[in-house]
A protein has these predicted regions:
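Active-site loop-to-helix "anion-binding N-cap" substructures in soluble metabolic enzymes
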Residues: 2-348, 354-426
C-alpha cells in the first residue's frame, strides 16, 4: 500500500532552505502601531522605499477594535457583512492575509478584481481589501452611486509611487523631442504609453488621453500586441521587469529596450538616440517583493528538492524568470499549482500570503516560497481584520469611512485606458 504523501509545513520548508530570520521584527507588531509613527511602507518588503510626502495616512483606529480578540473581530465582520447583505461587495486581492480573504465575495488578481468591480451595480458599497491603486480602479469602473472604501488608507504601493504624473509628463515631453510627435508614413504613432495596473489614476488618465492603455500581468502580452499595432514604440511604466520580460518573450531584443530613469537627465541614456531606436522604453521601477527573488534562491530550491518546478511572477528580474520553469500572473500561479499532480514540489516566486494559502490548500503537494527570508508586501499587510470590522460597522451606521474617489476628469480619461484593456482581454 502506497503511503499518503504529506507535505512539510512552511516552517519545515523554510528550515530546510536555511532561513534564519523573518524580513523584519516589526512584522510581529499589529499594523495600527504604524498609524502613529512616521509614515512609511514598512514593515515588509517595501520598508526601504521612499514614501511620497503626499501619501494618504490612516487615522488612529478606535480602542475597541485594537483591543478586540481575533475571534471577536471575525464575528463582528461576519455579522456586519450579513446585516449589510446585498448592499455590500467585498473584493480581496490574492496577497491579503487569510483572515481577510475568508470574508471576500471575490478573490483574484488586479485584473480579475477590476472586472468584478463592474459586476455588482446593485451593491451600494464596495470594500476593497487591497491597495490604493486597486481601490481607485474600482471607483473608476463602478457606478457613481457606489462608494469604494479602502479599510486602511496606508495600504499603498511602492511600485505605483515610483512614477508620478509630473515625472511621466516630463519624460513624454523629452521623448517627443527625441522621437518626434507626428505619426509615421504608415500612420503609426511615435510612442504608445502603456501603464501597468499598479499605477495611480492620474497615470491611467495620461494613457487614456494619449492613445495608450492599461495592462496587468495576466494580459501584458495581448496589450503590447495592441500597442505595437498602433505605435512604433512603447513607453512602459512603472515596472521595468514586467515590461522587459513580456517584450523579450515577444522577440524584442534587449538592445531595443533602454531604461528611463526619472532621476537622471534625459532618462540616463548615454546617447538619447537610444530612445529613438527603441521598441520598448522601460521606466526604472520595480516591485520590492518580487525584486527579492534571486537566481541563487532558484538554485537552492532545486538542490533541496530535486525535480522541483519553479514558477515566478513576471515582476521578477529577467534572470530569475530565465532560471524558472514558468512565469505568469498570480492567477497563472494559482492555476499551475491546482493542476500539478499530487506529490509535486513547486517553488513559487511571489508574495508569501498567497504561497502559504496555496500550501495549505494543497497539502498533497510541497508548495513553498523561493525567498527563505519570507517577506510580505508591506502595504497589503496593513489590511488587518480590525480595520475591516471598523469600516463595515461604520457603513452599517451610515458613515462611509476611507472613501476613495477619483475626480471626474481623471476618472473619465482613465476609464478610456481601462476600457481599452478590457476590450483587449475581455
Amino acid at each position: 500500500m502506497t503511503a499518503l504523501f504529506t507535505a512539510p509545513s512552511v516552517d519545515e520548508i523554510i528550515a530546510k532552505l536555511g532561513a534564519q530570520s523573518t524580513c523584519d521584527a516589526g512584522l510581529t507588531q499589529d499594523p495600527w502601531h504604524f498609524d502613529t509613527t512616521t509614515p512609511s511602507y514598512g514593515p515588509g518588503a517595501s520598508m526601504l522605499d521612499r514614501l511620497p510626502a503626499n501619501a494618504p495616512c490612516q487615522q488612529v483606529l478606535p480602542d475597541e477594535y485594537r483591543k478586540a480578540s481575533d475571534e471577536e473581530l471575525q464575528q463582528r465582520i461576519s455579522d456586519a457583512k450579513q446585516r449589510l447583505g446585498s448592499k455590500l461587495l467585498i473584493l480581496g486581492h490574492f496577497y491579503q492575509r487569510d483572515e481577510i480573504i475568508k470574508h471576500a465575495d471575490f478573490v483574484g488578481d488586479s485584473f480579475q478584481l477590476a472586472k468584478n468591480a463592474t459586476e455588482r451595480p446593485d451593491a451600494d458599497h464596495i470594500v476593497f481589501c487591497g491597495v490604493h491603486f486597486m481601490a481607485e480602479t474600482a471607483d473608476i469602473l463602478s457606478t457613481p452611486e457606489q462608494s469604494v472604501t479602502l479599510p486602511n488608507l496606508s495600504a499603498g504601493c511602492s511600485m505605483a509611487d515610483m512614477a508620478n504624473i509630473d515625472q511621466v509628463q516630463e519624460c513624454w515631453d523629452q521623448l517627443g523631442e527625441i522621437c518626434g510627435t507626428q505619426p509615421d508614413s504608415d500612420g503609426l504613432q511615435q510612442i504608445i504609453p502603456v501603464t501597468y495596473m499598479n499605477s495611480s489614476a492620474a497615470l491611467k488618465a495620461f494613457c487614456g488621453r494619449n492613445g495608450g492603455i492599461v495592462c496587468t500581468s495576466s494580459n501584458a502580452h495581448a496589450v503590447l500586441e495592441w500597442a505595437f499595432a498602433r505605435g512604433k514604440r512603447v513607453l512602459f511604466f512603472p515596472d521595468q521587469h514586467l515590461g522587459r520580460n513580456t517584450a523579450r518573450a515577444m522577440g524584442i531584443p534587449l538592445s531595443e529596450m533602454p531604461l528611463w530613469d526619472p532621476f537622471k537627465a534625459q532618462g540616463g541614456a548615454a546617447d538619447p538616440a537610444d530612445y529613438a531606436r527603441a521598441k520598448m522604453i522601460l521606466w526604472k521601477g520595480f516591485c520590492s517583493v518580487h525584486q527579492r527573488f534571486t537566481v541563487e534562491q532558484v538554485e537552492r530550491a532545486r538542490k533541496a528538492y530535486p525535480g522541483v518546478k519553479v514558477i515566478v511572477h513576471p515582476e521578477c528580474s529577467m534572470q530569475v524568470v530565465d532560471a524558472a520553469d514558468g512565469t505568469g500572473s498570480t492567477a497563472y500561479i494559482v492555476k499551475e499549482i491546482a493542476n500539478a499532480p499530487a506529490g509535486s514540489a513547486i517553488a513559487v516566486g511571489t508574495e508569501i500570503n498567497l504561497v502559504n494559502r496555496l500550501a495549505a490548500q494543497y497539502p498533497d503537494k510541497t508548495v513553498f516560497c523561493l525567498d527563505p527570508v519570507v517577506c510580505p508586501c508591506s502595504t497589503m499587510y496593513r489590511i488587518h481584520p480590525a480595520y475591516l470590522a471598523w469600516a463595515l460597522e461604520n457603513l452599517e451606521a451610515g458613515n462611509v469611512v476611507n472613501r476613495i474617489t477619483v475626480d471626474e476628469d481623471t476618472a473619465r480619461e482613465a476609464k478610456v485606458a481601462l476600457e481599452r484593456m478590457l476590450r483587449v482581454h475581455p
